[in-house]
Structure formats: structure tokens, C-alpha cells
């Protein structure tokens, strides 16, 4: 009867009073049968409280206390009555005994009996007392004892609050964190967030617990949610952390931004509004945490560029350039923003510095360009590369070639241009890889002379790498595609003598291995280049002589 809610349907104040009086009479009968029965005394005290007879309730509780001085259910009722009557010192002593007993759950059965305003008094008292204990908490071995005492008061405050004790839950969770009880702290943070999903302090607290449990992704998730809601609260929390704790968290935020940006740019799917908010919140927060970190400045520049906020992006880029004037990553972004303004030449100059240094970062920046911007960039970069190469500076031309290739998608013309640069720089392996990419493109009949020249170039590269057999094979393919053009090219380089020597050595090896048709082809190709070569003529005779009857030579 006492536990009925005040909002019980059709329940008038008079009826409630009647219930309480009936309970009191029943409790009095029970006490008459057994004066030492604590439950009956508590029932009588609760009924008297509901009847507004606080002094009589107090007397009833004193009787129960005399029989069991440490009974937490009696102590907490007495404390609440003393608070109601304004006797704060007495109430504090009683609450202290309850806290020391550890039986904070005794409040559970009182929530529907005592008036909300009285429970609020108890909650405020316990919460305030816990904060006082924590503020006065000493260092060393006594620190843990004070923290546990504060937890006991907070637990009373939480029970008294029912479902509205988020502040006490928050402080208790932090106390558990201080004691290293991470999972218990997580339980309290989760309890807050179930009722208040947007509680920023709880999100921050849970993020730090996740971090302590090596759950970095979950920590970043919570911190991002908090940053979107109230960066002004979150940033001081992060700044208050020790460096060894702050570092993985800020790095996690940085990485999350990069992943989101890359996913958006590479898939072509526009960012959702919540992702945009998260990116801006993270990017701006990192700057406020450490404005002297160049990579974070560049991150915010990229975020703003991706969102089309070029002027604001330029402002942050200038800060990055001020911090690290020689940064190639910053210079490349300056080039990108210049391209957005229509200055293609300046853009090419800025972006080419990454082409040979950091192709991954350059690839990211190129994704920020639309198709016409890319096309202009490719054409200008290729033209600049060709001009510089003509001036005899392959090292400088190389980065422009690479920019054209990365922006233009492995265009054969641009690849051949880079092959020429790499060959002059004697980077034969890399030149060969580029040329092989060219040769993977199917050739039309009109392209056969061009492809023949590609095989001549391939043979020369293999020759430079010491692979004479490979060179002979490439020269053979060139002669098969366009004989006259290939002969002229080979006579020019590597020259008549060297080309004939390559075919001679290859033919001799084929003959020794009894690959008669290959040997014959090598001899014939060698004599095309040098018809009077005595060694090749002798090899031709030997090949005819040793060839078996089953091998037809033409």
C-alpha cells in the first residue's frame, strides 16, 4: 500500500493517507507481537513519514536503532529525516555510517515511499560530500581509501536519484577509473549514455576507458561523437591527458579523418552530413589541441578542399607553409589550390614535387580534381617534361613525366617520355618496367612501326642490364613487326657491330642447346643488320650442318 505511486489511477490524497494509517495500525500490531522485529519498526516509521508525523517516525527509528546500531536501512531513514528537519551534522554522521557499511542498496526499497524532494536532499548531500572527499584526497596509499569512501557516497546519491543521477554516475565512473576498475567504470558510463546518448562528458569518459582497454577504434568513435556535440568541452579533456595517453587518441582521430576522406574520394560517394560534421569537428579540434603540428594543418586543408571551401583551406595551408616552408606536401596542396583558381602552370610546378616522392599522397590530391582540371594538368605536365628533357635535364623532367602518368592513367605517350628520362638517368630496371606497361597495350596496324621501336628500346635496355639473350629476343620482335624501320633504329643504336654481336652470341647458344630454328632466326636477323659479318656467316653454315632432318630451316 505504501509503495503505490502517487499517480495511481483514481487515488486521492485522502485515500493515500488512509492507506498509510492502515499500514501504521498493522505495523503497531506486529510490534506488539514482537517488539524487536526490525521490519515492523521500519514499516511503522515509513507509515508515520507518509502521514507527515516526522517526530513520531524519528522516535520509531531510534527504537529500531537501539536494537541494531549498525542497521543501514534504519540509519539511512534517520539520515533522510534529519536532513528534512535541517539537522545536517547529524545527517552527515548517519550517512557516513551507511557509507562505511557498504550497504548502499538499502535505499532501493525507499524510493517509492519517500517524497522526491526529500530524496533530492539526500542525493545532493551525498554527492556534495563525495566531491569534498575527492578534493581532499591525499596522495600515496591513503588515496585509494578516500576514493572508495567517495564511491560509497556516490552510490547512495545514485540510489536516491533513481534514474536521474547522471552527475553522480559520472563522478563514480571516474573514481572506478582511478582505481583501475575499467569495466565497472564502463558500466556506469553506459548507464548514463543509455538515458542521455548526448552526454558529452560520459562520451569522453567512455572513450578514455576504451583507450585504457586498447580499444582505439571505439575510443575514437566516442570522441568523435562528443566533438560533434561540444568541442569546447572535449578539447580541454584531451589536453588534460598525459602525453602518452593523448598521443594515440589524437593519432586515432587523424587516421579516422584520413580514412573517411580517402573512402569518399576513391569511391566517388558524397560524404553524408554526419561524416562532414565529424571531419570538420576532428580537423578543427586537432588544430586547437596543437596548432604547431603541420600534418594536422594539412589535414584540415584537405578536409576544407574536399568540401569546396578553398579560401578557408588556403588560410590553413599558409599556416602549414609558415611552419614548414620546404614541405613538399604543403607545396603540392598550394599547387592544387592554384589549379582551382585556373593557374595550371603553377599547379603543375607545385604538384610535381610529390610525383617522385609520395605517389600515395599525390594520388589522394588528384582525386580532389574534376575531369577537365585533370586533363589540363596532364597536358601541361607532359609538355613541360618534354621541354625540360629537350634541354638535357632528365632529372628535372622526370617528376613532370610521373605527374602526367599518375594524373593521366598510364598513357603510352607519357610512359615513353619517362622511359627516355630514366634511360638517360641509367635507371634501366625502372625504364624497362614502364616500357613493358606500354607494350601491354594492344597495337593497331598503324601502330606497328611505333611498337617495333618500343621493342628496339626494350632490347637496348636489356643490353644495358647485361641480358644479351633478352635483347636478342626484343630485337627479333622489332624486326618481325617493321623490318626496315627496326634495322635503321638498330644501326643507330646500339650500332651495327653490337647488334650483330648480340645475334651471334644468341645464335651460338641456341645452337648449343639444339634450338635450331631459334639459332637460324638469330643468324638471319644478324645478317640483315650486317650482311658481311664473317662470324654470322660461319654460324649459318654450322647451323645447316648440324640441323637434324626433322628440323626444317628456311
UniProtKB/Swiss-Prot annotation:
PROSITE patterns named among the record's database cross-references: TPR, TPR_REGION
UniProt TPR repeat ranges: 38-71, 166-199, 200-233, 294-327, 328-361, 411-445, 452-485, 500-533
Gene3D superfamilies membership: Tetratricopeptide repeat domain
Record key words, sorted: Repeat, TPR repeat
Transmembrane segments: none
Superkingdom of origin organism: Eukaryota
Protein name: Tetratricopeptide repeat protein 34
Source organism of the structure: Mus musculus
Organism taxonomic ancestry: Eukaryota, Metazoa, Chordata, Craniata, Vertebrata
Amino acid at each position: 500500500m505504501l509503495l503505490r505511486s502517487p499517480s495511481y489511477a483514481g487515488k486521492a490524497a485522502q485515500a493515500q493517507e488512509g492507506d498509510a494509517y492502515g499500514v501504521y495500525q498493522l505495523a503497531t500490531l506486529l510490534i506488539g507481537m514482537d517488539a524487536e522485529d526490525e521490519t515492523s519498526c521500519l514499516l511503522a516509521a515509513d507509515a508515520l513519514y507518509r502521514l507527515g508525523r516526522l517526530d513520531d517516525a524519528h522516535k520509531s527509528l531510534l527504537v529500531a536503532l537501539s536494537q541494531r546500531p549498525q542497521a543501514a536501512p534504519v540509519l539511512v531513514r534517520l539520515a533522510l529525516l534529519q536532513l528534512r528537519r535541517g539537522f545536517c551534522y547529524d545527517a552527515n554522521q548517519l550517512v557516513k555510517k551507511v557509507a562505511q557499511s557498504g550497504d548502499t542498496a538499502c535505499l532501493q526499497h525507499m524510493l517509492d515511499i519517500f517524497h522526491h524532494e526529500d530524496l533530492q536532499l539526500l542525493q545532493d548531500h551525498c554527492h556534495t560530500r563525495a566531491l569534498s572527499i575527492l578534493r581532499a584526497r591525499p596522495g600515496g596509499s591513503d588515496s585509494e581509501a578516500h576514493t572508495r569512501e567517495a564511491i560509497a557516497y556516490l552510490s547512495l546519491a545514485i540510489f536516491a536519484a533513481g534514474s536521474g543521477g547522471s552527475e553522480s554516475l559520472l563522478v563514480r565512473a571516474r573514481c572506478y577509473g582511478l582505481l583501475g576498475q575499467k569495466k565497472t567504470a564502463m558500466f556506469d558510463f553506459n548507464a548514463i549514455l543509455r538515458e542521455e546518448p548526448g552526454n558529452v562528458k560520459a562520451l569522453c569518459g567512455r572513450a578514455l576507458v576504451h583507450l585504457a582497454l586498447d580499444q582505439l577504434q571505439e575510443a575514437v568513435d566516442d570522441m568523435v561523437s562528443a566533438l560533434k556535440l561540444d568541442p569546447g568541452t572535449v578539447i580541454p579533456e584531451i589536453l588534460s591527458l598525459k602525453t602518452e595517453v593523448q598521443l594515440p587518441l589524437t593519432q586515432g582521430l587523424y587516421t579516422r579523418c584520413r580514412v573517411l576522406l580517402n573512402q569518399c574520394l576513391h569511391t566517388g560517394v558524397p560524404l553524408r552530413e554526419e561524416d562532414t560534421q565529424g571531419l570538420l569537428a576532428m580537423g578543427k579540434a586537432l588544430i586547437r589541441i596543437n596548432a604547431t603540428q603541420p600534418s594536422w594543418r594539412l589535414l584540415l586543408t584537405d578536409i576544407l578542399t574536399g568540401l569546396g571551401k578553398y579560401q578557408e583551406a588556403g588560410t590553413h595551408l599558409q599556416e602549414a607553409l609558415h611552419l614548414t616552408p620546404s614541405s613538399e606536401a604543403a607545396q603540392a596542396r598550394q599547387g592544387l589550390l592554384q589549379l582551382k583558381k585556373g593557374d595550371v602552370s603553377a599547379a603543375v610546378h607545385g604538384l610535381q614535387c610529390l610525383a617522385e616522392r609520395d605517389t600515395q599522397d599525390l594520388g589522394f590530391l588528384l582525386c580532389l580534381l574534376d575531369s577537365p582540371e585533370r586533363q589540363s594538368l596532364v597536358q601541361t605536365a607532359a609538355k613541360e617534361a618534354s621541354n625540360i628533357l629537350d634541354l638535357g635535364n632528365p632529372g628535372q623532367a622526370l617528376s613532370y613525366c610521373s605527374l602526367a602518368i599518375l594524373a593521366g592513367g598510364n598513357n603510352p605517350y607519357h610512359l615513353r617520355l619517362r622511359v627516355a628520362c630514366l634511360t638517360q638517368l641509367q635507371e634501366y630496371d625502372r625504364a624497362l618496367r614502364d616500357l613493358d606497361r606500354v607494350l601491354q597495350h594492344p597495337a593497331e596496324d598503324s601502330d606497328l612501326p611505333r611498337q617495333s621501336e618500343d621493342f628496339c628500346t626494350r632490347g637496348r635496355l636489356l643490353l644495358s642490364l647485361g641480358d644479351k639473350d633478352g635483347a636478342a629476343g626484343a630485337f627479333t620482335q622489332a624486326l618481325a613487326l617493321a623490318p626496315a624501320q627496326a634495322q635503321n633504329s638498330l644501326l643507330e643504336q646500339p650500332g651495327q657491330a653490337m647488334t650483330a654481336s648480340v645475334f651471334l652470341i644468341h645464335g651460338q647458344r641456341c645452337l648449343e642447346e639444339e634450338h635450331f630454328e631459334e639459332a637460324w632466326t638469330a643468324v638471319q636477323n644478324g645478317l640483315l643488320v650486317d650482311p658481311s659479318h664473317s662470324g654470322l656467316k660461319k654460324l649459318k653454315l654450322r647451323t645447316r650442318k648440324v640441323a637434324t632432318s626433322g628440323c626444317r630451316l628456311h
